[in-house]
């Protein structure tokens, strides 16, 4: 397993069973008063965004970067959804072109393709 920090709360996790990108954030948020430090805009997002799975923890703009998700993250990625009581996160991601979702349950282990086990 290899974990690559990609700025703020973002990371890419690579395993023999697949790859997961978590909370990718690059563009300024909150009226451009928040921005990633150090600057992560020059990372190879074409490669980093080509993943099997995407995990966005919540809709705060320093975790959910719609512009970046639209431009760089593979729409073939399966989105790992937390067990939230509303569909707002899924709705926002569907609006960006993501189509494949795995709805997780809290405190439950989920086995993904290739045998990768996760718990959200």
Regions found by a protein language model. Name each.
Residues 18, 74-78, 98:
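A short helix->loop->beta-strand "cap" motif at the edges of active sites that frequently abuts
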Residues 1-9:
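Bacterial Sec-exported substrate-binding components of ABC uptake systems
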Residues 12, 28-29, 59-64, 86-89, ...:
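Active-site environment of divalent metal-dependent phosphoester hydrolases
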Residues 82-120:
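Metallo-beta-lactamase
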Residues 57-59, 73, 81-83, 102:
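Glycine/small-residue-rich loop that forms an oxyanion/phosphate-binding "nest" at active or ligand-binding sites
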Residues 1-2, 14-20, 109-119:
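Beta-strand-turn-beta hairpins that frame and shape the catalytic cleft
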Residues 16-55, 59, 66-71:
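Pre-active-site segment of Zn-dependent metallo-hydrolases
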Residues 65-73, 88-92:
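Metal-dependent catalytic neighborhoods of phosphoester/phosphodiester hydrolases
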